[in-house]
Amino acid sequence: MAMAMANHHTLGLIFGILGNIISFLVYFAPAPTFYRIYKRKSAEGFHSLPYIVALFSAMLWLYYALLKKDAFLLITINSFGCAIESFYILLYFFYAPMQAKKQTLKVVISLNVGVFSILVVLIQFLLKGSNRINVFGWICASFSVAVFAAPLSIVAKVIRTKSVEFMPFSLSFFLTLSAIMWFAYGLLKNDPCVAIPNILGVILGLVQMVLYGFYRNAGKEKMEKKLPEHIIDMVMLSTLGTSDIHPIGAQQNGIKKSGSEDVKDDEETGNREKSTENSGELQPNGSTV
């Protein structure tokens, strides 16, 4: 019996460490997007809401981990999550237009300060002991389910357009892997609040990867037909991890016919940067325990 418990504890520790490592990588997924913002000295065309929501999620799970005993691995990853999402938001705020700054400030004050403070005060004064942990744990789980379910709009978009252009395989793979690790951790630690939301994460991740395999060739054929006609500048505007594609400018392919190598190089560089932005903004850590 003691040996079985020791094995459970060891396995839980292993899965928790692996979950931390993979979640660290996922948290860095938007880094190319913010490097692009830094280089442009402008955040115009981008939204801060996905990162505000990711910060709120990390704050919830961090507080839950502090209420529990023996939750060091939850504390480490969500402390890091709070730090890096705060950095992303500050960088966005620094380079955003004035109207976007005002909107970002309103949401941060309302959600990350207001709602979070109300939840903490209610939990601290209305509940005690294990009830406090259980109730707040299910609040965290419910929020994670909502965030995991949000990318269903991406799945619908892939099916509708038969294109996986805006659903990068690598990001879907690492999010699925992260969900598997945290599901196993929650199961071994007998923590349903951690395990249950990640069941949905695993299922959704597998669906995304299957769709990627099914539609990737169709997407390439469509892109080959479209590319000679237009060069479209797009940004991914995400809400709770969902993505909508908004064209903010289009040029005919022959708009600059100087024939210079610089123009061609600029277009190729732009396409690569846009591809980086798409993978960085698609699902910016919608969930992480």
Swiss-Prot record:
Residues 249-289 are annotated as: Disordered. Keywords: Cell membrane, Membrane, Repeat, Sugar transport, Transmembrane, Transmembrane helix, Transport. One of its GO terms (cellular component) is plasma membrane. The keyword Transport applies. GO terms for molecular function: sucrose transmembrane transporter activity; sugar transmembrane transporter activity. Belongs to the SWEET sugar transporter family. Forms homooligomers and/or heterooligomers. This is Bidirectional sugar transporter SWEET15. Residues 1-10, 67-70, 128-134, 189-193 are extracellular. Mediates both low-affinity uptake and efflux of sugar across the plasma membrane. Residues 277-289 have a biased composition (Polar residues). The keyword Repeat applies.
